[in-house]
């Protein structure tokens, strides 16, 4: 089974891209889809209705959505394989820029909107720098100069990334992506690990402590003016 992880900020066009991939590959591959989100998601319903493919969704609840994705992915891969799928597509919530959801197998695709601003790639960290492919959407809504600046910014963050520009609603210029999916290796689920390093650790805010100010917290902390070495860890 092949695997595709699609990440990107909200409203960048991730689901529109998933629909184009499904529409173009469904005749040759059986596709399964998992949506990971926080509060509400309807993408699984839309894809099941439009393409009659097996779909599921997971709400992360109190977990970071990408942490939740790591937690459920083993079971999700087993579910997709048991569904007889040749291609498993996972769409992340796109909310945690530090916790890149990509794996060391399969393909990782980041979806970026042309109208998100030219500095967006620099702010997105590992979501861009660890992706295999960047799909830039809504190219019909910006000028050629803006497109070129955005492309340059993406290349500065990740010089080796493959860049594709598209209007995902119409599916223009995506044939290269379809070919890459076809040619990608099948995953070995028992050997899957995250492509990048996760954040340093869990802070006391993550586990529910509400007080404001580092003095009230312990573990991994951060001060306004402290150097990294002295603000990295504080005992109870």
Q: What is the predicted role of each segment?
A:
Residues 2-16, 21-26, 184-236:
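P-loop NTP-binding site
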Residues 2-104, 139, 172:
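Nucleotide-state-sensitive switch-loop elements of NTP-binding domains
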Residues 33, 110, 134-136:
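Structural beta-sheet core signal
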Residues 41-45, 119-124, 146-153:
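Short, glycine/polar-rich helix-capping loops at beta-to-alpha or helix-loop-helix junctions
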Residues 50-51, 104-105, 129-130, 157-159:
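Short, structured coil segments at secondary-structure junctions
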Residues 69-74, 172-185, 204-209:
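Short, surface-exposed amphipathic charged segments that create phosphate/polyanion-binding patches used
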Residues 92-116, 123-132:
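Inter-motif core of Ras-like GTPase G domains
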Residues 133, 140-195:
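Canonical P-loop GTPase G-domain recognition
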